[in-house]
């Protein structure tokens, strides 16, 4: 009986090691910053920032989608595959229309198997336009 347990344990360990090897990550996206603080933005104006990233892995990856859950943000990003050692960017334009503080999340989806998605955040406050008070 102990012999059978030993065989089963060996099979389980080999299975675990082979599964672990299959999910090895060869591409890896690294962002310089994942949060951008705008500070104070005047109501009715646009604020822009850029999130830069680099491929620190061994194989190319691509950004498959970038989503936000707010109509106040316009997004542009590197569409071509990013080779190892190369960099890319995601440009963000925020339309400041409602006075008050804001914190908006941007979800980045890539072919990097090590990441489900990456969250980027923009923060700040929208000040009331002078003369509108």
Predicted segments with their positions:
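Bacterial Sec-dependent N-terminal signal peptides
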Residues: 1-25
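Long, low-complexity ectodomains and other extracytoplasmic segments of secretory-pathway proteins
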Residues: 21-45, 52, 113-133
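Short strand-edge motifs at loop-to-beta-strand transitions and within beta-strands
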Residues: 36, 86-92
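Beta-strand-rich interaction surfaces with strong enrichment in secreted/lumenal proteins
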Residues: 39, 77-82, 93-94
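Short, solvent-exposed loop/turn segments enriched in Ser/Thr/Gly
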Residues: 43-50, 97-105
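Asparagine-centered strand-capping/turn motif at beta-strand->loop junctions
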Residues: 53-57
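Surface-exposed binding patches on compact interaction domains or structured appendages
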Residues: 58-86
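Beta-strand-rich extracellular modules
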Residues: 95, 109-113
């Amino acid at each position: 009986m102990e012999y059978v347990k030993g065989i089963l344990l060996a099979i389980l360990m080999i299975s675990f090691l082979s599964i672990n090897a299959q999910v090895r990550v060869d591409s890896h996206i690294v962002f310089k910053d994942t949060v951008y603080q705008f500070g104070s933005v005047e109501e009715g104006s646009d604020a822009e920032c850029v999130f830069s990233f680099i491929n620190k892995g061994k194989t190319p990856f691509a950004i498959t989608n970038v989503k936000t859950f707010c109509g106040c943000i316009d997004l542009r990003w590197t569409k071509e595959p990013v080779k190892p050692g190369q960099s890319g960017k995601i440009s963000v334009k925020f339309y400041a229309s409602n006075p008050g503080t804001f914190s908006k999340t941007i979800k980045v989806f890539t072919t990097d198997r090590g990441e489900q998605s990456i969250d980027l955040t923009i923060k700040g406050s929208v000040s009331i336009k002078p003369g509108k008070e």
